[in-house]
Design a protein with these regions (language model features):
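Well-ordered beta-strand positions
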Residues: 138, 178, 182-184, 190, ...
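Glycine- (often His-adjacent) and acidic-residue-rich active-site loop
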Residues: 64, 72-109, 155, 239
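Conserved CoA-thioester-binding segment of acyl-CoA-metabolizing enzymes
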Residues: 2-71, 108
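C-terminal long alpha-helix characteristic of the crotonase
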Residues: 140-145, 197-242, 271-274
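Glycine-rich beta-to-alpha transition loops that act as phosphate-gripper elements at the mouths
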Residues: 120-126, 180-183
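CoA-thioester-processing core
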Residues: 106, 110, 126-179, 209, ...
Length: 274
């Protein structure tokens, strides 16, 4: 029997047009979380981030759930970042600090779920979408999937320290430099080779592979899984230096506002270094 919990997620905030939704359903101990905004490659709106947080808080206390799957709707993207239109309202570096702090809290809710988590990826996994996937314990993807944070080409913003720590642990520092400083996108083969992906399989086999991995995880000791997750998270996040001054500098720059304006206008940005 499937428990469809979409209504509770929708009710947490009012829904503007094309704001997208995050759906939750639970079947036989497996929770499925779906990012549903396929016409925009599942780019996250503020509403979707709020719904995701509400869902994670609900799952955290649901002891019937053994595994959580995160997946994008439509087959073209997992999540293609945060909807850039929303950044037009940013006026200062403080807005960027508040945004990164909020995103960190949301990603932390995924990371701190007590049960194993799996990102099932088909297509673009960019920016905030890469952060969501990286917060999961395991990831499987299709061969055409792409991974990156091309903000040096698009927005001219930066990442939080905790987001950088997660990406560096998952990919290695040099690959993170390629993604951030060269705006490169990594393919599925490279993501598999460096250990970021558990498996690469054809689109028709993706859901079956996810079900198989969920079955393996559900048979194993949940306390061991939970304690291991928490211990690794403590190791990763211990003693991270503060970087809010860097975030404020970046989001408060003229280049950031130029990046947003250029993206919305569908033109190439003109960077000035200011």
């Amino acid at each position: 029997m499937t428990d469809d919990l979409n209504g509770s997620a929708r009710d947490c905030v009012s829904k503007p047009m094309n704001a997208g939704e995050v759906h939750l359903s639970i079947n036989a101990g497996v929770a499925s979380v779906v990012f549903d905004r396929p016409l925009s490659r599942n780019a996250m709106t503020w509403l979707m981030y709020e719904q995701l947080g509400s869902i994670c808080r609900r799952l955290r206390v649901d002891h019937s759930v053994r595994v959580v799957i995160f997946q994008g709707a439509g087959g073209e993207a997992f999540v293609a970042g945060t909807d850039i239109e929303q950044f037009k309202a940013f006026n200062s570096g403080d807005d960027g600090v508040a945004y990164e702090r909020t995103i960190d809290q949301g990603i932390g809710l995924i990371e701190s779920l007590p049960m194993p988590t799996l990102a099932v990826i088909s297509g673009w996994t960019i920016g905030g979408g890469l952060a969501i996937a990286t917060a999961c314990d395991f990831r499987i993807a299709t061969p055409a999937s792409r991974f990156g944070v091309p903000i040096a080409r698009t927005l001219g913003n930066c990442l939080s320290m905790s987001n950088l720590a997660r990406l560096s642990a998952a990919f290695g520092v040099q690959r993170v430099k390629r993604m951030l400083m060269l705006a490169e996108l990594l393919g599925a083969d490279e993501a598999l080779a460096c250990g970021y992906l558990q498996q690469v399989c054809e689109p028709a086999e993706l859901n079956g592979a996810a079900a198989t991995l969920c079955g393996r995880l559900a048979l194993l000791a949940p306390v061991t899984q939970q304690v291991t997750k928490e211990a690794l998270q403590r190791l990763l996040m211990r003693g991270l230096p503060d970087a809010e001054d860097l975030i404020s500098q970046c989001y408060g720059s003229s280049d950031f506002h130029e990046g947003v304006d250029a993206f919305v206008a569908k033109r190439s940005p003109v960077w000035t270094g200011r």
